[in-house]
Amino acid sequence: MTSIKNRTSIRKYSTKEVSDELLNQLLEDAMRTPTMGNLQLYSIVITRSEEGKKALAPAHFNQPMVTGAPVVLTICADYRRTTLWAENRKGTPGYDNILSFMNAATDALLFTQTFTNLAEEAGLGTCFLGTTVYMPKMIIDTLKLPKLVMPVATLTIGWPAEHPALSDRLPLRSIIHHEHFEDYTPEKIDDFYAEKEALEENKEFVRINNVETLAQVFTDIRYTKKDCEAMSQGFLEALKQQGFI
């Protein structure tokens, strides 16, 4: 699969339609992804209408690709279908807990990545929206998600109208541990991040954000402690609302 080596997030799309036939084929093929106990603990809400995309946009900080993409997929951790099946077959389900959410979320995210690979191999562009877990209650309300269904990922999909450069990646040695975890020394951290910090585009991020280091762009500007704690609380409240805790 050559597309994975050249993949980039696509945020601008042409007006060319993504056919139901192609979308359904990709979704069906993605169902071959690994799944816990062969239960397929996920569901996908397809949004095509302008009205539907506009309703979802605020939950994703009004990023333009939400309304600009032909298709938006919201992938959900879904233990509701399995629970109702069990209840209707004399089973006694006990999936209103954090372990069950983790199992369903893992299934959903595996499906998301498999679908992404297949879609991009077919020539489509995609963008994974991490904002799904920032304000999940807005998505729950908009999509009318019932108990034991929790949004965990969003993909925008369409035919690319841009060809952005590849994003940088850390070297392979930064993620590999042999036989046991080897903790990170200051020297290793310097080595792992040297190339990233030396990129002109990242130096520009440091300059325009008026900070001293690239790390501060992330900790002080993009993903602050205050925001992470507030969104964590909102996520926990959404999990409780959806019956997982």
Predicted features and spans:
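Acidic, surface-exposed loops and disordered segments
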Residues: 1-245
